[in-house]
């Protein structure tokens, strides 16, 4: 008989001896119903004796007796637990898989097994072998009845399962059927299934396949897992599982105690204040029932529960997600040691095909933000295999998912996320320590040994010193690249400061234009976070509402998104708040009337100016929507909501705009800058009236605001500040248009303020040097309004540009009066060089800018030679006056000294002739010589005794050396009328020959 004829022996044996097998099954039921020894459910491995006592005896057929060793003829059912799997049911050894001591029936000869047949091991079907199965009429008696009981049919179906063909030999299987499942024991490990191994006392090892628990009869154990690759525990369960059970029990007790204390406090508060609200009690009862069903979920925020865990769950912009992921993957070379993937060059396209597109690109000189971002991401790495920008800066409004995006992208790229908040600890030392610990250290013994990725949240709240410290860490160089110093000192310095930055840093901020981030913006990879798409956010909110049992239509969710400006965190918190209050349905009225969900954020000035000068988009009214109910609710108050809703009709579109701009301007707070922007831009808007009545009305509003602001500042009456936000509302109703306005930052106030400061400085410089006689009669205001314009006419006389020796008497007198006037008002001419390289004389201080408007025609100025002549004469006259003043002062001092000397010498009042005053140069030289000559004091020792020096006799001595050189020079100068002084050096001045007689 060929080998393929034996494929159906097992099935034929089962079908022919169905009645005998049924009797055996009934006997096995009696045996299995006997009580056995109790053991713990958590115990996963039994001894071999326990397996024998708990298992079923193996029978060869109905009349055969079990033979073999008493130590181990059969194996018991072993309960093990694995995640989402359980052990196979009670197993039964096959007779052909034990040793020779087990009885082997001579029913069918055991043929030699073929080499390897893929069909035998991999094809688990039975239909292919049904045709080849032949009944062995010589050895097997046909069953007495063709009818099969339900129990037998169930057993047939189980016997014909896939495990029936996993037996290696072709001998007939003698299986003890059970009520639940059929048992299998294998000699070799199965190929396509999980398994466990069992070794008997005689050294025989068998394998049991693991199957899923489809009926759910066995209780699943959550954290207890079976792994064939790990060693078995002596306790039967891992110690971590026992520890976790203790922690869960402790946590449950703490929660129960806190719940009990909360209920006790609430009851005391209700008794004290007498709050008996039936609705609140009903809501609390409903909430209590839900808490009993799902206790851990009630104590957690929905924002944390439904936060995205994977890249595909993100709600943010796809382009922003890809850019951040690309930048993070640039670190793979230095962090993970992976080579950078070279981007394939784009295919060459015929330039004639996109001629117009190329021409348009050539015309645009500036690159877009997308092009700049792509260039940064495609740039070459530095010689340390790091990207050009070592820090990434995510900036955008709060609640859009910036922190969530950074966490998800970092985990997706294979990093261990280390988060720190820059607003928690603002000290630079703590900031430095935490950054270095996150970027230069690694967990060695911890569970997560992945490289760290530092995420710094709210970095716009960090001081400038901390930002500078972060930049110094980012720009830190290697020891070989450090400039200056020896190699040893450089090594010590780098050892103290640390090494290079080899880990990515992601910074998150709300306002990128904070002064402290000015230096960081220049070196960081900037990513502006756009608003979330409303369609994505509405879909996610709908999924969350459905999971939590709330009913919400798309219109209400869209209105909630518009109210919160697509703030994900605010929307989810609003849903949780409403769900906690017991509301099971979210409609349009509840969204519009509730006071929650508003963002506590100030908009930028440009956004506010744009909303003031631009009409809002016309939106289609949704079903069930009532216009501006929230504004009406805020105006009427919270006491009589129903009466207020019935008393006044809904607001129209103009009233909506009124309240929206009023709320916007109130939340801004910067009234001065807002007013300046309105003043500089309202004349650029389109005016419908030809008589400019709107412009006049706007100027009246500006005047009113200026008066109110001045009253507030001068009188400290801050109650009037409530009227300042109405100016933007008036400008919106007067100048708002549908087109997008071109807003320019206000500069007129700054220019006027700088001009005023400049004029005040000119006047102060002029008045500070005016003679006291004039200053007492002329104030700054009267000088500007009355005197300066006429003074400029006085300073422009008609003089000939010739030498002063050629002036007539009248011209000399006119020049002298001009010089006296300019010196009296501290005015002169200074030479300056223009941008073209020419030299001009300008009035200093230039009071002409104070009293002359730039649009008025300039009077005929003086010529260059005339101004030069006037400037020279002013300098000479100033020197003469200074010298005369000094001489008068010195003469007065000498007279006072002489009078005091005479009074001391002649106390009786005798008059003596006054000594003539010495010349100026003589006084100077005498004073100089007096300072140069000094009396020598005798040298003394420590005890104050005079030291006598032995002077050596000079070799050659003359009588002329008795006096010192200084004294002889002083006498020579004092006794002569003319003296000379030699100046060593070179002079390029004009020289002429003179005689001594000209000097005398």
From Swiss-Prot:
GO molecular function, one term: ATP binding
Broad class of where this protein is predominantly found: nucleus
Binding positions (ATP): 396-403
GO cellular component, one term: nucleus
Keyword Cell cycle part of the UniProt annotation: yes
Alphabetical keyword list: ATP-binding, Cell cycle, DNA replication, DNA-binding, Nucleotide-binding, Nucleus
GO biological process per UniProt: DNA replication
InterPro entries linked: AAA+_ATPase, ATPase_AAA_core, CTF18-RFC_complex, DNA_replication_fac_RFC1_C, P-loop_NTPase, RFC_lid
Pfam families: AAA, RFC1
Cystine bridges: none
Segments of skewed composition (Polar residues): 60-70, 888-898
SUPFAM superfamilies assigned to the protein according to its UniProt record, in alphabetical order: P-loop containing nucleoside triphosphate hydrolases
Keyword Cell cycle: yes
Acidic residues bias: start-end ranges: 272-295
Region (Disordered): 53-89, 130-159, 272-301, 888-916
Location of the protein in the cell: Nucleus
Quaternary structure and interacting proteins, as annotated: Component of the CTF18-RFC complex, which consists of ctf18, ctf8, dcc1, rfc2, rfc3, rfc4 and rfc5. The CTF18-RFC complex associates with pcna.
Family stated for the protein in its record: Belongs to the activator 1 small subunits family. CTF18 subfamily.
Its biological purpose: Chromosome cohesion factor involved in sister chromatid cohesion and fidelity of chromosome transmission. Component of one of the cell nuclear antigen loader complexes, CTF18-replication factor C (CTF18-RFC), which consists of ctf18, ctf8, dcc1, rfc2, rfc3, rfc4 and rfc5. The CTF18-RFC complex binds to single-stranded and primed DNAs and has weak ATPase activity that is stimulated by the presence of primed DNA, replication protein A (RPA) and by proliferating cell nuclear antigen (pcna). The CTF18-RFC complex catalyzes the ATP-dependent loading of pcna onto primed and gapped DNA.
Protein name: Chromosome transmission fidelity protein 18 homolog
Lineage: Eukaryota, Metazoa, Chordata, Craniata, Vertebrata
Protein encoded by which gene: chtf18
